[in-house]
A protein has these predicted regions:
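Conserved donor NDP-sugar-binding/catalytic core segment of glycosyltransferases
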Residues: 97-130
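A short, conserved alpha-helix in the catalytic core of glycosyltransferases
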Residues: 168-172, 178-229
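A conserved acidic beta->alpha catalytic loop
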Residues: 16, 25, 38-48, 65
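Short, acidic, metal-binding catalytic loop of nucleotide-sugar glycosyltransferases
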Residues: 24-33
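Active-site-adjacent helix/loop segment of glycosyltransferases
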Residues: 210-286
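Short aromatic/hydrophobic "clamp" motif used to bind/position activated sugar donors
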Residues: 85
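Glycine-rich, basic loop-to-helix element that forms the pyrophosphate-binding segment
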Residues: 63-80
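Short, flexible, basic/aromatic active-site loop/helix in glycosyltransferases
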Residues: 134-177
Length: 377
């Protein structure tokens, strides 16, 4: 397999217009790349739209049924012969130079098994999406404890905050990661044993990238975030997909942490004994229509504003800024789709949770773009 060309794969599910934009960005960044679109829609109208709208150099693969994200990627990989495979969500786009930066990182370090760009939530590149967090059996149990204890919630949330800050500020060098998001990732195929699929098809959606990350690490390969490479991912909150996530989580824990399933028993006992806290970080309600947060004077040289659908602020979207005011991204908050948004403001440097300002705000749904979530990884 050669290194001179990259195979880029986009999985489509009834969102052709988004897929066109994703493919356009890939070709604008690297015209010689091999583009493969795998359509999971099982819909003749969607297939016709893809045939009519995709550029001639893009290969279209029609799946006979909706086989899920990971299996569709595996199907697309069969169309390429390159060692490097770029995976991109249809609701994502790469910025110029992204593919070259990722390829250069893999070229320069044979121990890297996969790399990802820094993903932004907006075209102005102010809001950064969270780095992936590798789930483990003990980690899941700790998360359940955090839902039931303000002290545990504070400690775990701060640990994730520091993890995110390291990823968001390390823009000059590769930042080592324990896991990467499959929504925008370049993988070295030769990092896996011959004959082993990139993704385990047991995962219909969610956790397939966690599974891949864990396997690559067990094969002695490293993972990294390449801050000089950038992508746009128009993520939307999709609470209706929670059952899919729970099903995949069970498969993941059974596969990798079978010997540690006592953590699951501990979780079940904990759940039965104590219900989760509704507001573990004591978030304060924002005033209706509020557009700015006042930044305390000691933080005005550099602050971090985070947004999250979770009261634990895990994971969170971040914006690094300075000055006396932090503006709330009201248009972007519509992507929370009628779910509360939790906000946290604090200095960029490491600090105690008691020093941070945490808020909760009601959001409004943006029905005009409701199709985005159907394509989300």
């Amino acid at each position: 397999m050669g290194h001179d060309v990259i195979t880029s794969i986009v999985v489509n599910y009834r969102c052709a217009s988004l897929t066109f934009r994703a493919v356009e960005s890939l070709l604008a960044d690297m015209p010689q790349a091999t583009i493969v679109v795998v359509d999971n829609s099982v819909d003749s109208v969607e297939a016709a739209a893809l045939r009519a709208g995709l550029p001639g150099q893009a290969r279209l693969v029609l799946s006979p049924r909706n086989i899920g994200f990971g299996a569709a990627c595996n199907l697309g990989i069969q169309e390429g012969r390159t060692d490097y495979v770029m995976l991109l969500n249809p609701d994502a786009r790469v910025f110029r130079g992204c593919l070259g930066q990722l390829k250069s990182a893999l070229d320069g370090d044979a121990t890297l098994g996969a790399v990802s760009p820094l993903q932004y939530w907006d075209t102005s590149r102010k809001w950064m999406l969270p780095p992936a967090w590798l789930p483990t059996g003990p980690g899941m149990a700790t998360l359940e404890q955090a839902w039931r204890s303000g002290r545990w919630a504070s400690q775990l949330s701060l640990a994730y905050r520091q993890h995110a800050i390291a990823a968001w500020t390390g823009k000059e060098i590769p930042v080592g990661q324990r896991a990467l998001s499959g929504g925008a990732m370049m993988v070295r195929r030769s990092a896996l044993p011959a004959g082993e699929s990139l993704f385990d098809p047991s995962f219909f959606m969610y956790y397939e990238d966690s599974d891949l990350s864990l396997r690559l690490r067990r094969y002695g390969k490293k993972l990294a975030l390449i801050g000089g490479a950038a992508a746009l991912h128009e993520w939307e909150n999709a609470p209706g997909k929670a059952p899919l996530m729970e099903a995949s989580k069970s498969i993941y824990l059974e596969k990798h942490f079978r010997d540690l399933l006592h953590w699951q028993t501990r979780r079940e006992r904990l759940t039965a004994r104590r219900p989760p806290l509704e507001n573990p970080l004591n978030a304060q309600a924002l005033e209706s229509g509020q557009q700015f947060l006042d930044v305390p004077q000691p933080w005005q040289g550099g602050w971090l504003l985070e947004l999250s659908p979770s009261p634990l602020m895990i994971p969170s979207i971040g914006h690094l800024g300075n000055g006396p005011f932090a503006q709330l991204p009201l248009e972007l908050l519509k992507r929370f789709r009628n779910c509360p948004a939790y906000l946290r403001l604090g200095p960029v440097e490491k600090t105690k949770n008691s020093n941070l300002l945490t808020f909760v705000a009601k959001t409004i749904a943006d029905r005009s773009d409701a199709g985005v979530s159907a394509c989300a990884e």
